């Protein structure tokens, strides 16, 4: 699949979608995007910047949701024009899709909305690349039906994203078999290594997380075989306004990506999956 100027697929080099969970400020967005662009250029990893202008599914009414549509979209436009990177953001049922599509390069649908047929089809009808997150409640083989709804709009630029599955209350686990199963859709499969260590709503009205397990799960996913890696990162995760406990420190990204790139190259050299 052609994606933001590069080829994405199981037999292609690993690409990265990364950035802070939510837009906190223009300064932070430009800083992180610039840092990640330079890092990925050095490592020769295709890169898409991500951040959200509105986190509509925060656990608490008092949690920070973002700068809002107009200001957030303006910041994403500056990231794209000033830093020179493609950008991804998530959209919701009440998002003005035409306005967002005029700025961003990739649309993302939240995991909680993956079963909303009208929503999935409206997003796919924008004819932009779409990263569809698999719901925490959904079996991997059910994603073929979600993908079919999107592709019924004539859009073949669809990705399937694994972000963990509910395991009891306030806990997620990653079943690596799901990556293999979702590849059967024919779409590039993306692994979200940061939300997969989230402890949803498990910290007194806010989500906790176990970021120490991010490297292990990311390496496992790359070894199984994926097209892209999704990671939320922040210069100071403990002070992040959203999803800090499951965000990876920005200054540790390069070391981790170096190991993942090496693992990806080994998998794609010796794999019999394609």
UniProtKB/Swiss-Prot annotation:
Pfam families: DAHP_synth_1. It comes from the Bacteria. Gene3D superfamilies: Aldolase class I. Disulfide bonds: none annotated. It is found in: Cytoplasm. GO terms for molecular function: 3-deoxy-8-phosphooctulonate synthase activity. Its main location: cytoplasm. It catalyses: D-arabinose 5-phosphate + phosphoenolpyruvate + H2O = 3-deoxy-alpha-D-manno-2-octulosonate-8-phosphate + phosphate. Belongs to the KdsA family. This is 2-dehydro-3-deoxyphosphooctonate aldolase. The gene is kdsA.
